Amino acid sequence: MNIPADLLYTKDHEWIKVLDDGTTALVGITDFAQSELGDIVFVETKPVGTELSEHDVFGTVEAVKTVADLFAPVDGVIVEVNEALDAAEVVNSSPYEDGWMVKVSLKDASQFDALMSAAEYSEMVGE
């Protein structure tokens, strides 16, 4: 299983990557999550401009057998939705690169302290 060291993780199997500008971040689901869900057929997110609080549901992922909520790892505002999600299977094939869900404008960087490192996430999922 792929667990990139440069990302932070939640217990709900989302990842977040702060971009070089330091004010925005990409959010998606982990390789573990996509493998547990199986073949993803549809992804729906809230629209650009939606304000999120940590743990808010910002969308859903529909797989052949189940539907799962997507949870915001931090407070922020959705500033972009990944258009590649129109082909939802990209989440299975590239969860950390092409399959990101939303880009958020960050509000409080101190919230990162509550997120897990790659090593902590790996331990949580038993890798």
UniProtKB/Swiss-Prot annotation:
All copies of the Lipoyl-binding domain together span: 24-105
Annotated Gene Ontology cellular components are:
cytosol; glycine cleavage complex
**What is the disulfide pattern of this chain?**
none
Q: Which GO terms describe its biological process?
A: glycine decarboxylation via glycine cleavage system
Q: Modified residue N6-lipoyllysine is at which positions?
A: 65
Listed SUPFAM superfamilies: Single hybrid motif
Q: What InterPro entries does this protein map onto?
A: 2-oxoA_DH_lipoyl-BS, Biotin_lipoyl, GCV_H, GCV_H/Fam206, GCV_H_sub, Single_hybrid_motif
Alphabetical UniProt keywords = Lipoyl
Span-the-membrane segments of this chain are none
Q: Name one Pfam family in it.
A: GCV_H
Manner of cofactor binding, per the entry note: Binds 1 lipoyl cofactor covalently.
Q: Would I find Oxidoreductase among this entry's keywords?
A: no
- Name what cofactor the protein needs: (R)-lipoate
So what does this one do? The glycine cleavage system catalyzes the degradation of glycine. The H protein shuttles the methylamine group of glycine from the P protein to the T protein.
Give the family per the record: Belongs to the GcvH family.
Outline the subunit composition.
The glycine cleavage system is composed of four proteins: P, T, L and H.
Q: What is this protein called?
A: Glycine cleavage system H protein
Q: Which organism is it from?
A: Prosthecochloris aestuarii (strain DSM 271 / SK 413)
